[in-house]
Amino acid sequence: MSWNNNESYMRKNIRKTVLLCLAILLMTACVDNQVPPQSKEFIDKYFPQSSIVLVEMDDDDNDGKEYSVLLNDGTKVEFDLQGEWKRVSRKKTGVPSTLVPKPILQYVKTNYPEDVITKLSRKPYGFKIELSNDEDVRFNPQGQFIEKID
């Protein structure tokens, strides 16, 4: 009698586990579908080991509506409605060097050899970076230094 109860209990738990796994897979697929194809390509190119865990639509920014995408490694990427990246924030390991314009990388290596770029933003004047030492620096569209921001 107790064997039948245990078997029934195990079947219920297996069903619940399978349903939970399916729900998680479906939620992940839904999250990926919320991102424009151009944004998804960007994420796949620069963050191939990461997956999307959250997509939010923001419209309280002065720059207009945008998507905020959070990756499972803590990276946050913000895109405009066309799927163009606006900001990349990656506190733990820094922004991928392949994403940063070469003159900006060289400037940081020369002037801040111990620091990494934790945030890269596209701005009307060019680029703004935030460093691991909490300094902010502005660059023109060609990646040439403009100024440090206090």
Segments (PLM) and residue ranges:
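A cross-family detector of function-defining hotspots
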Residues: 53-71, 116-132
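Extracytoplasmic electrostatic interaction patches
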Residues: 96-150
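Amphipathic N-proximal alpha-helical interface segments
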Residues: 65-90, 132-150
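C-terminal motif of bacterial Sec signal peptides marking the signal peptidase cleavage site
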Residues: 28-29
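Short, non-transmembrane alpha-helical segments in secretory-pathway proteins
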Residues: 32-52, 95-116
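Bacterial N-terminal signal peptides that target proteins for export
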Residues: 7-18
